Amino acid sequence: MKSNPKYFLMNDVERQSKYSPKYVPNNSLKERILEFLDYYIAPLKLYLLSYPMPDCLWDNRKLRLKASGVQVTPSSEPVHIDDRLIHISQKQPSE
């Protein structure tokens, strides 16, 4: 009985695609490490950067807020505002 080589080739390709695991790179390990750091290290960081702190180190309010994760806005704001809508809303009705 003669076997068809085309059939065996097709069968072999099917078998390869079905049973051979192919490595698909993903970021699961990296994500797990980052989650671990967020879960265990972030509270330690918050604890270390919170009050009470040594004198002359974190007594500056801006640095304290930055350490707690609050966004610090610059204290020096422009004196002259060039927004026309604000000027219109600030005008008195008599003007």
Curated annotation (Swiss-Prot):
Domain of life: Eukaryota
Descriptive protein name: Uncharacterized protein ZK637.4
Species: Caenorhabditis elegans
Classification of source organism: Eukaryota, Metazoa, Ecdysozoa, Nematoda, Chromadorea
